[in-house]
Amino acid sequence: MARDEFPGWHGTTIIGVKKGGEVVIAGDGQVSLGQTVIKGTARKVRRLSPGGFDVVAGFAGSTADAFTLLERLEAKLEATPGQLARASVELAKDWRTDKYLQKLEAMLIVSDGKDIFVITGAGDVLEPEHDVTAIGSGGNYALAAARGMMDSPRSAEEVARDAMAIAADICVYTNGNLTVETISA
């Protein structure tokens, strides 16, 4: 089968919600190959602690590529302790300019409890305007749902869980088996 004909790994939904002095990153557990669900219990949200500095990261895209990027992010955080923004920018620069990294197909949401960023292979480090961001195939559904709940009395975790439930109901590449990590500044 030629590379262009390979159906590829599809879908996931990752959301980051900053509210009430904490950040919650949640992700579903579904991994699909074409129209087939391969696994329903994948962990796409991880807690990293390079040099004792806690960061939560969620990823969408190729798992192997995401792990490569998470390792690079950990190295950047060790080189710039406590400076998530700087480490994220350094990772994005490497990702955009390194010939090997340019081929990686993944996106990351990262947070240290104070800041939350989306890091892309295009060299972007984006901080959400409305304290909520989402990536992946169900990202737009989760983002819209969460934005509609941000003024409610729900906690960051409740907003994230409810938004993910809505995304899982709409997006066939997203399931309701969530991994949720909370981090405070």
Curated annotation (Swiss-Prot):
SUPFAM superfamilies: N-terminal nucleophile aminohydrolases (Ntn hydrolases) (SSF56235). Na(+) binds at A168, C171, T174. PROSITE patterns: PROTEASOME_BETA_2. Its main location: cytoplasm. It is found in: Cytoplasm. Protease subunit of a proteasome-like degradation complex believed to be a general protein degrading machinery. This is ATP-dependent protease subunit HslV. The lineage of its organism: Bacteria, Pseudomonadati, Pseudomonadota, Alphaproteobacteria, Rhodobacterales.
